Curated annotation (Swiss-Prot):
Keywords: ATP-binding, Carbohydrate metabolism, Kinase, Multifunctional enzyme, Nucleotide-binding, Nucleotidyltransferase, Transferase. Its EC number is 2.7.1.167, 2.7.7.70. InterPro entries: Bifunc_HldE, Carboh/pur_kinase_PfkB_CS, Cyt_trans-like, PfkB_dom, RfaE_dom_I, RfaE_dom_II, Ribokinase-like, Rossmann-like_a/b/a_fold. GO terms for molecular function: ATP binding; heptose 7-phosphate kinase activity; heptose-1-phosphate adenylyltransferase activity; phosphotransferase activity, alcohol group as acceptor. Catalyzes the ADP transfer from ATP to D-glycero-beta-D-manno-heptose 1-phosphate, yielding ADP-D-glycero-beta-D-manno-heptose. ATP binds at N193, L194, S195, E196. This is Bifunctional protein HldE. Residues 342-473 are annotated as: Cytidylyltransferase. Homodimer. NCBIfam families: cyt_tran_rel (TIGR00125), PRK11316.1 (NF008454), rfaE_dom_I (TIGR02198), rfaE_dom_II (TIGR02199). GO terms for cellular component: cytosol. Gene3D superfamilies: 3.40.1190.20, HUPs (3.40.50.620). One of its GO terms (biological process) is ADP-L-glycero-beta-D-manno-heptose biosynthetic process.
Amino acid sequence: MILPDFSLARVLVVGDLMLDRYWFGGASRISPEAPVPVVRVESSEERIGGAGNVALNLAALGGEVDLLGYAGEDEAAAALERLLAVAGIRSHIERCPAVATITKLRVVSRQQQLIRLDFEDGFAHLDPAPLVTRFRALLEETGVVVLSDYAKGTLACVEEFIAASRRAGKPVLVDPKGVDFDRYRGATLLTPNLSEFEAVVGACCDDAEIERKGRALMTRLDLEALLVTRGEHGMSLLRPTAGALHLPAHGKEVYDVTGAGDTVISVLAAALAVGRPLTDAVALANLAAGIVVGKLGTASVSPEELAIAIHGQRAPRRGAITLAELLDVLIPLRRAGERIVVTNGCFDLLHPGHVHYLEQARALGDRLIVLVNGDDSVRRLKGAGRPVNPLPHRMAMLAALESVDWVVAFDGDTPRDEICAIRPHVLVKGGDYADITAIVGHDCVLETGGEVRILDFVEGHSTTRIIEAIRNG
C-alpha cells in the first residue's frame, strides 16, 4: 500500500459544530452542601468538537478543508473560530443570534470525568436556505463532501445537501445518526458503526448476516457503498456489484474509541479526494482507526503515523519464495486492499531494460511478483546453451531489485497455473502483443476482475544481443 499525497485533497465538511471545554482540577473533599466532590479548578482547555473534529482530522492529514455549519453569536462561537483558524481550517459559519453555540463542558479530576454540562438549543428550527446557498457555492471547489450528523439540526435538510452533491458529481460520505437512514437516500457511502447499523436493520450474528442486511439497505437507499465499523472486529465494506470486504482491526491496545469514527471518515474522504480506489481508502481508514484507538481522548492521525503503520504491515519475508509461501503471504495483503501485480519471464542476463520494465510494472500496484522460468523451461524455450545464469542466480538478482517484492520459479512451459493460483489484480507482459488474449493467464485474471497490461520494452537492450556480443568477442 502506498501512502497518498493528502496535501492534494480538498474536502467540504458539513455538520453540527461544537466547542468542547475541559476544566481540570483536584478533588480532595466532599461539599458540605451536597454529597458531591468539590473540584478546585487548576487549568482549562478548549477543543474543536462535533463535525469540526472531522475537519481537524483532515487538516492533520495535510488536506485542504472547508467547514460549514451553524453557531450562535456568542463567546463560544468566537473561541471556535479561533481554534479553527489555528488548525488551518477554512470556516464558513452561519451565525444565528437566536441560538447558543453548542458547548460541552467537562469537569475532569485525576483523569476521571465527573460531570458534563451541555449548552445547546439545536438548529432544526432554523431556516436552512442560507446554509444551503453557502453549501452550493462551496461545492464547485471541493473534491469530496462529508456530512457529519450529530442530530443537532444542521443536517435537517440533509436530502438537499446529498442531491446538490450528486448533481455536481461530488462523492458524498455520510456519518449517520439515529434510526431514520432513509434521510440519507442517494449518498455515495454511509459509515455507521455496528450499533447504529443494527438499530436500523436488526441484530446481526455473523459476517454473512451483515452482508445480507447491508445489501438490502444499499438497495433501499440507492447507495454506492456501505462501510460498517465494528470496533475490535474491524470493518466491513459492502458494494452492490462486488464481494464483501471484511478487514480485521489493526489496534493492538485499545485505550479510547472517542472520535474513531471521525478519523475513519476523514481518511476515507481524503484518500478518495486524491483519486485512490475505494478499497485502498478503506484499508487506509482501517489502519488509521487502529492508530487512533491507541490514544487517549479525541485524537487525529498524521501522515507520518500512517506511513509507519503501512511499513510495519509489510510481509516479514521478501525475495525468493515458493508458490505456497506466497499464497499465504498474500492473504492479509488482500484483506488490507493491496493491489497485486504479476509479470513473468526468463530474465537470464539482467540488464537496464529489465530494470526499467519492472519499475513500470511495480508502479501499477502495491506489490510486484515476478514468475521466473526454471532452467529446463528456459532451455526448451531458448535452445541449447541457455540459460547463461542458473535459476538461483537469476532469482537472487531479481530479488535484489527494489521494485520486486517476491520471485517465484515455475517449471512448466508457461506460468498459467501460477497466475491462476495467485489471481493478481494486474497481469503485466512486455512486448508487441497485438491482443491481450495472446498473453498466458489472461483469462484467469479477467475472470476474477483483474486487468491485463502490455508494456513496451526499452529499445537497445536485449539478452540475446548481449550473449552474441560476448561470443563474438
